């Protein structure tokens, strides 16, 4: 099998395609969450904390000199990134929890019930016939 044929077989597997779709949707979801945090969540929090804009929070290590930009630690952006992460993690957790609940329900439905009355009766008849043959 040539390298190209092997790659086609690999890429056409369902799991690889599902993973690719998941990555694309995840990237789009990440942008939505970042916008939600930066544009919806952080402004009211900043207002409550006295008009603080978290994206501007930084510690200047070295001031700008001429054309050389300042050296800063932008911890406000880091705080926003942490909140993004927490929201995305919670959304993924809730999604997985829902999927696991559905899987459990399907497994419970697939579990066969005990023997039916007909099966129990046939088992009793079989046992009686075996006991009569043994006499």
Swiss-Prot record:
Summary of subunit composition and partner proteins: Homopentamer.
Assigned protein family: Belongs to the MscL family.
UniProt KW Secreted keyword: no
Keyword line: Cell inner membrane, Cell membrane, Ion channel, Ion transport, Membrane, Transmembrane, Transmembrane helix, Transport
Role of this protein: Channel that opens in response to stretch forces in the membrane lipid bilayer. May participate in the regulation of osmotic pressure changes within the cell.
Protein name from the UniProt record: Large-conductance mechanosensitive channel
Primary gene name: mscL
Compartment(s) where it occurs, according to its Swiss-Prot or TrEMBL record: Cell inner membrane
């Amino acid at each position: 099998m040539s390298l190209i044929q092997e790659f086609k077989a690999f890429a056409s597997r369902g799991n690889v395609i599902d993973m690719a779709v998941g990555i694309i949707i995840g990237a789009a979801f990440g942008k939505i969450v970042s916008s939600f945090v930066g544009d919806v969540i952080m402004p009211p929090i900043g207002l409550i904390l006295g008009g603080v804009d978290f994206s501007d929070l930084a510690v200047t290590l070295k001031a700008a000199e001429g054309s050389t930009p300042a050296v800063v630690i932008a911890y406000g952006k880091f705080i926003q990134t942490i909140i993004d992460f927490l929201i995305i993690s919670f959304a993924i957790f809730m999604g997985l929890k829902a999927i696991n609940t559905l899987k459990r329900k399907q497994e419970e439905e697939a579990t066969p019930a005990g023997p039916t009355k007909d099966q129990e009766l046939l088992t009793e008849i079989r046992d009686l016939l075996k006991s009569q043959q043994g006499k």
